[in-house]
Amino acid sequence: GCDGLDGIDTAVQGFDISTIPQEVSFLSHFNSKSTEGASGEFIRKYTEKYGADSLSQFGASAYDCVYAIYGAMKEAGDKISVTSSASDICDALKEVFGSGYTYSGVTGTDIKWTSDGFVSKAALKYIVKESDAK
């Protein structure tokens, strides 16, 4: 699969982009080169703290997961409390996520979930080719 290609660094010493015959294309939900919006802010803060070596779609996805759940918990309101059982919390979150809840974060905007838990969000097409090394 193409997981992680979004973090490909064509400037790494020893990386020979000419070994890519023409180009490699992949779909991703995160642009690790973004400088604008929520993703740009995430990238700036992340690289200030951890450096750019570990920046990838996986960290961005984890970040969005935490904040999507946080937002859904706020949306659930008093259906969730410190005394709620794990089962009750799960039921409340399933209700929120399955009833039109949307989240905008670093991996996309207006992210929605279906009633059976599948996520719906736009993917972006990226192309890595020899000209990227210049």
Language model: regions and residue ranges:
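Extracytosolic ligand-binding ectodomains
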Residues: 1-134
